[in-house]
From Swiss-Prot:
The modification N6-succinyllysine is found at K54. GO terms for molecular function: proton transmembrane transporter activity. The chain crosses the membrane at residues 8-24. It is found in: Mitochondrion membrane. The keyword Ubl conjugation does not apply. Its main location: mitochondrion. It is a single-pass membrane protein. This is ATP synthase F(0) complex subunit 8. It comes from the Eukaryota. Belongs to the ATPase protein 8 family. The gene is MT-ATP8. The lineage of its organism: Eukaryota, Metazoa, Chordata, Craniata, Vertebrata. The modification N6-acetyllysine is found at K54, K57. It comes from Phoca vitulina (Harbor seal).
Amino acid sequence: MPQLDTSTWLIMILSMILTLFITFQLKVSKHYFPTNPEPKHTPLLKNSAPWEEKWTKIYSPLSLPLQ
């Protein structure tokens, strides 16, 4: 059986990595990135829940009078 020639694998792998790096660099450089991003100002809406309008007293067992 003939031996597999692996002498060119290093050059192929390095050239592939270099090509991928250059390709991704070119793709990323074409994107627009804002220089100073600021958060959007959205109006704060207060959700009205029925339990927020009522006052309820919670009785704990320790605050009850002794019998």
